[in-house]
């Protein structure tokens, strides 16, 4: 049995990191979160632009906030509310605690003494949580506890040949050992619906796959017009890609060859599902990563051909570069990428050898090795899938 050393949480789930998160219940409290970060080095501040005045989308934000804060990579949460926003911060905190069992401390500026008092109390509580987190010890757990999130961004013509198949190799390995893999970016599955539906575990799952991809294609055409299939990002074109369909055939390689067990809406909790699962979500990288983490991914793997350096604040994100030119242009072995998948082309490495290299690297990361985005502090912010970010 394959095992790794993780942090077992009160609800039985396992984290690969041990963070104390400080987050605003609505974006009007972001400044307070930043003050707490300055007072208490070691906490992870989560900055966002949500929490109020988003009619029709608030249920999604509430789900994401609770999902993110319940991820087992977090030891404890400091939640700061203003008081006049749509949801009560203390009620949200109680929900997070019920789901995760983790320590949660919530304060409301308009009820708990104003900004300075809340900053002081939250800072004191954050220090206690950091001390508690420092007492946690990693324990040996089976790989079946892993939820592995996959992502690609800034793709080029080699992404579907080198980096994405390497992630697919890792995905198949995780599934074979009882774990869970998340494949997303539905806009980048357009044209592959029959391929993916053919891998579905049941006719019902196949129908879900076709539905989400066809719905996404209609949305893309609404925004981009009848030539939508030819419109891809400028960087993708510069990297040698030509159409959404070509890009999609490379994108889905991140899911390997395993049977697709289910389809989830954006950021919905994984709730014990095993095997390969599609999460409905956009191609926009920070939004996609937020959804993967909310669903339950403790570790992420992100391929790039053009050299996107983005990570995620609360999860290790292994950056795999599809080509050696970009890898060395961005610093090489001491630069912005974790793994050079271009070695398949320039060094004669076989695809399976690259895949095993990625497996070995991921195992080190699960056991505590920092990824490049973690070392460089390139976590980014929370971004949520909404009507304003449809693709």
Where do the model's predicted regions map?
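Metallocofactor- and cofactor-centric catalytic cores in central/energy metabolism, strongly enriched
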Residues: 1-391
């Amino acid at each position: 049995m394959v095992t790794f050393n993780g942090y077992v949480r009160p609800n039985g789930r396992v984290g690969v990191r041990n963070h104390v998160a400080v987050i605003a219940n609505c974006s009007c409290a972001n400044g307070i979160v930043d003050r707490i970060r300055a007072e208490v080095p070691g906490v992870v501040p989560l900055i966002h632009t949500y929490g109020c005045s988003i009619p029709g989308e608030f249920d999604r934000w509430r789900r994401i906030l609770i999902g993110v804060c319940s991820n087992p990579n977090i030891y404890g949460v400091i939640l700061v509310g203003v008081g006049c926003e749509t949801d009560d911060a203390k009620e949200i905190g109680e929900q997070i605690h019920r789901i995760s069992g983790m320590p949660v401390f919530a304060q409301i500026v308009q009820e708990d003494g104003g900004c300075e008092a809340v900053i002081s109390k939250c800072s004191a509580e954050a220090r206690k949580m950091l001390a508690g987190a420092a007492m946690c010890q990693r324990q040996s757990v089976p790989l079946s506890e892993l939820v592995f999130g996959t992502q690609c961004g800034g793709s080029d013509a080699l992404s579907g040949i080198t980096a994405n198949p390497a992630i697919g190799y890792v995905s198949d390995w995780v599934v074979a050992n009882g774990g869970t893999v998340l494949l997303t970016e539905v806009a980048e599955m357009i044209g592959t619906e029959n391929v993916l539906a053919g891998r579905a575990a049941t006719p019902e799952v196949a129908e879900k796959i076709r539905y989400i991809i066809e719905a996404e294609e209609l949305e893309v055409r609404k925004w981009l017009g009848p030539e939508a299939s030819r419109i891809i990002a400028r960087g993708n074109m510069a990297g040698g890609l030509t159409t959404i369909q070509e890009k999609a055939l490379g994108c889905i390689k991140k899911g390997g060859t395993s049977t697709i067990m289910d389809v989830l809406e954006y950021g919905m909790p994984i709730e014990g599902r095993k095997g390969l699962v599609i999460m409905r979500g956009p191609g926009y990288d920070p939004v996609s990563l937020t959804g993967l983490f909310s669903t339950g991914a403790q570790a992420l793997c992100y391929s790039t051909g053009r050299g996107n350096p983005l990570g995620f604040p609360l999860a290790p994100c292994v950056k795999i570069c599809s080509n050696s030119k970009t890898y060395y242009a961005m610093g090489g072995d001491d630069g912005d990428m974790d793994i050079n998948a271009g070695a398949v082309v320039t060094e004669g490495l076989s695809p399976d050898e690259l895949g095993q290299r990625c497996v070995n690297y991921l195992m080190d990361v699960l056991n505590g090795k920092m990824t490049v985005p973690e070392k460089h502090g390139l976590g980014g912010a929370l971004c949520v899938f909404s009507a304003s970010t449809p693709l």
